[in-house]
Amino acid sequence: MFSEQWGNIKARPGANRLIKHLKSNRVPTAVASNSSRSNIDSKISCHQGWKEYFSAIVGADEVQKGKPSPDIFLEAAKRMNADPSNCLVIEDSLPGVSAGKAAGMHVIAVPSVPKSSDEFSSADEIINSLLDLRPEKWGLPPFNDWIEGTLQVEPWFIGGPVIKGFGRGSKVLGIPTANLPAENFSDVLSEHTSGVYFGWAGLSTRGIYKMVMSIGWNPYFDNTEKTIEPWLLHGFDEDFYGEELRLAIVGYIRPEANFPSLESLIERIHEDGRIAERALDLPEYAKYKDSPYLRNPLQQGNVANGNEAEQEL
């Protein structure tokens, strides 16, 4: 039953980018999973090119013990003729981190459960998502796709009525945000990592504006729910609660982070705004200002399919 759904499961943000980057730089990679080998093959066959990208694939049924035992990782290193001490493991689970460390390898944790980073302290590094990976820290070729402090992402599009948020944007931060009802976008948000993004915002009766947006739990305020908080980089004379807001999210700036003070949080938000302002003038991002999705009233629900909206350009 589960195998029928694997084709609907998208890769984690940044996974395709990382795999292709390592392949193009001739860095051997392997899949080492607690799943059976047949299940691994079925899963990766749903992602174009993945089978050809990996030098080795090891399932739990091919070794004596699965994770947290090191057997899977040691077998993967053996098949690649690699010294375990020269291997870098990227893991999203605690048993996987334990297995990698037990194998004598370097381990980066990318927790799959929100707000669980403290549990992964045994890893050599903890990152919010694969978008935040810096390969050069581990002696690997660096990415060359960052543009003016930003990273292009496959555009995605959401829209809905502007609602009142926590009241912190204007009153506490001096930064008015145009909040959207996150519960309407649970499926979309589950596909995208928390962090600071940017793009274009269309207001049904006003026009199209540059925007920077946070998605996540806001560690400084310790939110209990994942939120979407766009900041339209324009001065408005009045509120626009209830107006239809459409967003084209086209780039990524950084992971969400905690800050030692309110002042440092505000300073960083303004810096994010300046980065977004400059980046959106670049042709790679500026072209999305003309997306029909930003100008046409929403027709079916509150969420647009990113690929379909992009094809309309």
In which residue ranges do the predicted regions lie?
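Metal-dependent phosphoesterase signature
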Residues: 1-20, 25
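Short, surface-exposed alpha-helical recognition segments that flank or form part
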Residues: 6-10, 31, 67-68, 260, ...
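Hydrophobic beta-strand core positions in alpha/beta domains
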Residues: 30-31, 109
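Phosphate/ribose-recognition catalytic cores of enzymes acting on nucleotide-derived substrates
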Residues: 154-313
